[in-house]
A protein has these predicted regions:
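Polyanionic/metal-chelating signatures
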Residues: 9-19, 24-27, 31-32, 54, ...
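Catalytic pocket of metal/acid-base enzymes, prominently hydrolases
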Residues: 1-82
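Short, solvent-exposed turn/loop segments enriched in Gly/Ser/Thr/Pro and often Arg
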Residues: 42-45, 85-88, 144
């Protein structure tokens, strides 16, 4: 969403403006209404582009993520996922908690044991237990096995690559394919 709305400003990890955030919220809501499970974002050094650059969402502002989470409001059973290095555990968890409180979305994050923060997982689980005692559905997920592939629309592997309606776009030039993917009928056929 960030790159789609902000272009190079997102790639350079510039702060999103209020207009950027509003545009991302519209697209996120459209995606959820079209069948997306929810919203996932990454603020970890581990996630990088193919050329080694940090992902555009690294260090995205807390207010940006909380605001985007509002797009899940009224969307029953949807998920807000945060992948983080947990530099500030209270701030990171506040994103999940606030989105869940305001929208009813399920919150999830990757729960890892980190050598440089050996007790972090216990703090995270304590925050989860506290949130669950307040009636929120927030869970840590243990990463059982790292995925070793790059997935995305311009890649050879993405969630739609085996759908005939998506395969029909394979031979189109990239810009043409993007235009077709914006078409509501094409989106509907793929989904």
């Amino acid at each position: 969403l960030r790159v789609f709305v902000m272009g190079d400003r997102a790639v350079n990890r510039e702060p999103a403006t209020e207009d950027d955030i509003e545009a991302m919220k519209v697209l996120l809501k459209e995606g959820v209404e079209a069948g997306a499970v929810g919203f996932s974002t990454s603020r970890t050094l581990v996630h990088r582009s193919a050329d080694g650059n940090l992902v555009p969402t690294y260090k995205a502002a807390t207010r940006e993520l909380k605001s985007l989470g509002e797009s899940l409001s009224g969307q029953k059973g949807h998920v807000f996922q945060l992948i983080s290095d947990w530099e500030d555990p209270q701030d990171e968890f506040s994103i999940l908690k606030e989105v869940s409180e305001k929208t009813g979305a399920k919150g999830t994050f990757t729960l890892l044991h980190l050598d440089n923060e050996p007790d972090l997982w216990e703090e995270q689980l304590s925050m989860v237990e506290s949130a669950q005692s307040e009636g929120l559905d927030i869970r840590g997920q243990v990463l059982s096995r790292p995925v070793g592939m790059m997935m995305g629309i311009p890649s050879s592997m993405n969630p739609f690559y085996r759908r005939p309606s998506y395969m029909a776009l394979d031979d189109l030039p990239w810009e043409t394919r993007l235009e077709r993917l914006k078409d509501p009928e094409t989106k509907s056929a793929i989904l």
